[in-house]
Amino acid sequence: MEQTKIDRINELARKKKTEGLTGAEKLEQERLREEYIEGYRRSIRHHIEGLKIVDEEGNDITPAKLKEIQRQKGIHGRKPEDNS
């Protein structure tokens, strides 16, 4: 998310505390917050999907559900036709 939008979120939050928001400003704040949260979720999801969990012996112990997502996206050399 662009810094100008984050600044606007903060500006609206400050205004809400001091003098209140108009109806249009409330809608704008809600829209900007949703956009921010969606971007945050995408970032976290992308980070988690990139994880590979390895035990002390070097064995891949990544959960099956995560491996399947990685197979679909071709992450960590996993290919859709791989079964392990």
From Swiss-Prot:
The keyword Cytoplasm applies. Signal peptide: none annotated. Residues 57-84 are annotated as: Disordered. GO terms for cellular component: cytoplasm. Its main location: cytoplasm. Gene3D superfamilies: Helix hairpin bin. It is found in: Cytoplasm. It comes from the Bacteria. Keywords: Cytoplasm. The keyword Cytoplasm applies. Belongs to the UPF0291 family. NCBIfam families: PRK02539.1. This is UPF0291 protein SMU_447.
